[in-house]
């Protein structure tokens, strides 16, 4: 097998990715499969960090639209990401990995505070780092949190796993003639309003020259193939 094209990555998983065929919570079979994928990538020599959303448990923005205070809702959403991070930590540790959960909000009896230098040290020591609670601030999505953490740890690549196999010009579930892009610039994504991540996350990654690959993770071994240079999904990088 060829050498790795990327040595340090951050993988962003949605909370919904943990549900499987359910409509809420965590499917043990799904999280176990995802854990195997992550460990396979790490055993190949990559330093792996994770950010997991919380939408399978709670979505603050949705309840804010129904009248809940937005800041309160977002704080509840941050706690949901901590729950998912702990679940993934457990799944990874059962497979023999060394894992650290680091939170943007203080929950010291449950996990570590996020400290950039410590996070990098964990990765250098062969531990998988899971970053929870987004940026620690309301009004920012976990996509923005993933972009921020990827920049802070000096990741070579930000990966976002989605339900589809890349970025399309329109919703492929609704339009049979939808066309998938192999590559895009950040400016093209923002100008065309392609809603695969929020604009703040795209702008952060663009301004830091961080490449982003958006792909589907339903196929076993796909993460490892990307690390070895396979052109899977859509690569977003650079400016127009």
UniProtKB/Swiss-Prot annotation:
InterPro entries assigned: AceGlu_kinase-like_sf, Asp/Glu/Uridylate_kinase, Uridylate_kinase, Uridylate_kinase_bac
Keyword flag Endoplasmic reticulum: no
Record keyword RNA-binding present: no
Catalyzed reactions: UMP + ATP = UDP + ADP
Pfam hit, one: AA_kinase
Binding site for ATP: 12-15, 55, 59, 162, 168, 171
Top-rank taxon, per record: Bacteria
Assembly and interaction partners: Homohexamer.
Protein name in the entry: Uridylate kinase
